[in-house]
Amino acid sequence: MEAARVGAQSRHLYGGGLGEPDMDRRDKRLFGWDLNDWRWDSDRFVATPVPAAEASGLALNSSPSSSEEAGAASVRNVNARGDSDKRKRVVVIDDDDVEDDELVENGGGSLSLRIGGDAVAHGAGVGGGADEEDRNGKKIRVQGGSPSGPACQVEGCTADLTGVRDYHRRHKVCEMHAKATTAVVGNTVQRFCQQCSRFHPLQEFDEGKRSCRRRLAGHNRRRRKTRPEVAVGGSAFTEDKISSYLLLGLLGVCANLNADNAEHLRGQELISGLLRNLGAVAKSLDPKELCKLLEACQSMQDGSNAGTSETANALVNTAVAEAAGPSNSKMPFVNGDQCGLASSSVVPVQSKSPTVATPDPPACKFKDFDLNDTYGGMEGFEDGYEGSPTPAFKTTDSPNCPSWMHQDSTQSPPQTSGNSDSTSAQSLSSSNGDAQCRTDKIVFKLFEKVPSDLPPVLRSQILGWLSSSPTDIESYIRPGCIILTVYLRLVESAWKELSDNMSSYLDKLLNSSTGNFWASGLVFVMVRHQIAFMHNGQLMLDRPLANSAHHYCKILCVRPIAAPFSTKVNFRVEGLNLVSDSSRLICSFEGSCIFQEDTDNIVDDVEHDDIEYLNFCCPLPSSRGRGFVEVEDGGFSNGFFPFIIAEQDICSEVCELESIFESSSHEQADDDNARNQALEFLNELGWLLHRANIISKQDKVPLASFNIWRFRNLGIFAMEREWCAVTKLLLDFLFTGLVDIGSQSPEEVVLSENLLHAAVRMKSAQMVRFLLGYKPNESLKRTAETFLFRPDAQGPSKFTPLHIAAATDDAEDVLDALTNDPGLVGINTWRNARDGAGFTPEDYARQRGNDAYLNMVEKKINKHLGKGHVVLGVPSSIHPVITDGVKPGEVSLEIGMTVPPPAPSCNACSRQALMYPNSTARTFLYRPAMLTVMGIAVICVCVGLLLHTCPKVYAAPTFRWELLERGPM
């Protein structure tokens, strides 16, 4: 359970701090739950408690922070009743809004609940002065600092960072050296960068600048980008605009209702002030309905704060004045520092009407707000603007205002798959009879809920309110209220309809639910770039988020995109705007969250102007499947990136797609067709692996059949890239019954695709060798007794792969592979296989003049089908007596010749051969060479006789005909 603080007095809600072993239901909801106490079925959407004996040996599903101020640590509860297996979580939170000397007062600390993150306890309590041991064997201290605590990394600095702000502890720098112009780190004079949050050499800074040159260049470039020029639409727009942002400010306060903190009492008073003035500003919203949001605050201590009420009234009055002002007035935006919110931002919402671009106000650092976090943990302002007053509202053109609001509000958010921004690419599953589908996710944040509250028919309820049934679905949950992430594969039109008509679909969900699960408490829903907020069954907000602005988080690539199972892999995430105070990286696999960490702790050096890099190490499970990497930016980023876990050879081939993502991310190519197809392939292969895992577990989960067209497109994608291992995996899945093939057999489906013909046309000798040697595993169902692929397999027009290879230029390797098949079918049918026109592969080779093909095949025929053979007779018994002659029992050696069958001949030629038995002498004269020699000799003799003179030969004695001797040559 979590540790919490009530006022200035702190008490731990475990061990002796409670006094009672059983907590009431509200306390359990209030202080969170442990992910290791529950086993989540990602397909059935059912959470089952883990037995205590089993849970005590489990490691945390979410990896702890790599920094010394790790955000979570599980501790065991050792109380008088001996319940030592009950796990608690104690984490440290710093409140930047209070001075350091107020952190520990009267023996008590500042304890709070972090919704959606790891709860934190800082201060004294029961056992607070002792070290506790978590399941990973690491030690944490609940109260106070220790001599071995985090220290400043500057040489010679002895500042203890235990009691300072979380920002300084995370980056291991004291407040003095964070603002100093020079500091010695690693025997080098450096300076702390305010944007990179790390030390750089002095030459990387411009004079008088607190941030390095590289970060400033990227920041200035983003500021110079053109922003949409829009205009104010009138009083109705003014009211709607103010209502939206005030309501979002209210939402930010509600995200932190569960924390019993004196700081949040001001937030309660602020809610009351906002509600009192909201009706006067926005007539379309009834304050009585909004007052229902205060029901969650009833457990907080009653109190009044006149200053806070004045602040709330000032906020509303300023909003009215600015919204009703001239066209160049500022966009009203509630500042979290004055609101006392969990963090200092409010969700930016795309307005219905355009707004006006205005000059930039004095820049103040903006703190993103997270529904999962009570505090972002960063400083309130940049050091360069410490003297600047905190404005109650910020303009949309401010560089520090969330630039989601810079998007032209007249443009609807693009519908994407995963992280792709292009909608022009055709899906792998969009051809040949299957509707165009996309894989995307829906996020439900269920406040004040625990896994035991989830209804057993949760899956049916979610599927019931969708316009069409998804072909594939999986999910996972994680703490911080209950964050339920559902990945679906839906038709593109269904995604668009769900996103555009969120209100009507949520009403349908509320009306179709039999219980009060959806109709009670706070519910946040996000579909693509559309957000909705419900409270006690009433829809309070339904707005789109502007997603194409410069600060919107987006993952461009994850490397490796495929990794072997049962290994520990170092992942590298590339993207835009990945690092912020409230952003967190999450890695999930098959319904489990296997890694989560704040992005500040895993950020790497920036090698590109706009691209940021995150590195993390994660142990992978021992099964094949598909995982997701997400970066949650304040709870309002919907981007994700898939990765594959499989065998090493499969991963090596799939990782070739990394070049596509890398080129598209660095070059920012306009045509994202290749990138979208690669993403779609990863998702489709992931769904197939997920289906295989379900069948291997023999779970009776209702599954829609995997369409044959989807399977065919996966095979085409792998064949085009000559991926033998992936092709083998797909063929194995086909023979295990994962694909809906109707009444056909797997052999018929495979052979009808003519894969060997396609490999020959691609001149892929590697793929040809694999296909010729592929044979389904005999342990599988419906296996073939012989090899599936044969060189003489007939395709269209009775063409065989041998015909195609013989007629193709520069295909010697392919023909060599075809004639080296395991059954020697290729060389046997080289002269016998005939196409529809009656020609053999040898005929095609002769016609094309491919003499090299003829010679190569002829040598193989002579080698493997030669005429000579040796027969060795081995007697059944050996006789010791040797006599002359050959006896039946003796060993005999016979060298014989195979007699080929007589070639067919015509009757006329046979009669002519009988009439002229000396055919050898007769046919010898007709040889071309002999005719030439005889012709020359006849000419020489005739010339000599005609001249009647003796020819003169100067190199030898005089030649005379009468001296010429006769005889055989």
UniProtKB/Swiss-Prot annotation:
Its main location: nucleus. A zinc finger (SBP-type) spans 149-226. PROSITE patterns: ZF_SBP. Residues 1-25, 54-81, 377-434 are annotated as: Disordered. Zn(2+) 1 binds at residues 152, 157, 174, 177. Signal peptide: none annotated. Residues 393-419 have a biased composition (Polar residues). Disulfide bonds: none annotated. Zn(2+) 2 binds at residues 193, 196, 200, 212. This is Squamosa promoter-binding-like protein 6. It comes from Oryza sativa subsp. japonica.
